[in-house]
Amino acid sequence: MAPFFDVVLLGDGELLLPAFIDALQELRGSPRRERLLRLAQLPGVYVPSLYAPRYDSDGQLIAIDPLTAEVPAQVAKQTWRGNTLSHSTVITPEAAWPSIHMVEVVRSCPELCRFCLASYLTLPFRTPSLDDGLIPAVEAGLGATRRLGLLGASVTQHPQFDELLQWLNQERFADTRISVSSVRAATVTHELASILARRGSKSITIAIE
């Protein structure tokens, strides 16, 4: 990986980015190797040039060894377990999904279908609470736009998704267009379809495709 990546962050940005950005600012102007060594000491930060792959006689990878004792032998993925997931911080008509406030409802998926990278790369399955996580995240963006996107590999499997739907069915959201990312076929209900239709959705993506 070293010819392509200087640094790889393993895990969730909520944990990785604050320390990573602070370290970059502290190291501004430092020699390249010093910067890479310092970054490699942060939890969840992998610097490929400071490690070497080791293979057996058949060419099978058996280990990835650190080239210096200053970096950890293994880099552990960092897993965010807070009560909030990500949501849009910049809302603009120039975005790929223009003028829409995105809110992450779930991270990963409990089904773990073998073909689905979204499930495995972001394990474990996590859900923020409705009152302290999702509702504040939704309201944070609706002052800037009346378009809301609910994101996740299987948003309808949030344990409080029905309550979220009822909350979004209030009259004060009558002018808000709501769309959802993929949902499992078994979780599509008449209530879900009706509320989404009333909020401007014309289609949904159903998994497994």
Task: Label each region the model flagged.
Residues M1-D65:
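Glycine-rich beta-alpha loop elements in corrinoid/cobalamin-binding modules
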Residues D6, V45, S108-C109, C113, ...:
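Conserved structural-core and active-site-/substrate-pathway-adjacent residues in large, well-folded domains
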Residues L16-P18, P53-Y55, P110-R114, T122-F125, ...:
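Flexible loop/turn segments at secondary-structure boundaries
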Residues L17, H101-C109, G133-G141, L168:
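Structured alpha-helical segments in the cores of large, soluble enzyme domains
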Residues P48, R54-M102:
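N-terminal [4Fe-4S]-dependent radical SAM core
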Residues T92-P93, R126-V138, L142:
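Ferredoxin-type iron-sulfur electron-transfer modules in oxidoreductases and energy-metabolism complexes
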Residues A95-L130:
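Canonical Radical SAM [4Fe-4S] cluster-binding loop centered on the CxxxCxxC motif
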Residues L134-E209:
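Conserved SAM/AdoMet-binding glycine-rich loop
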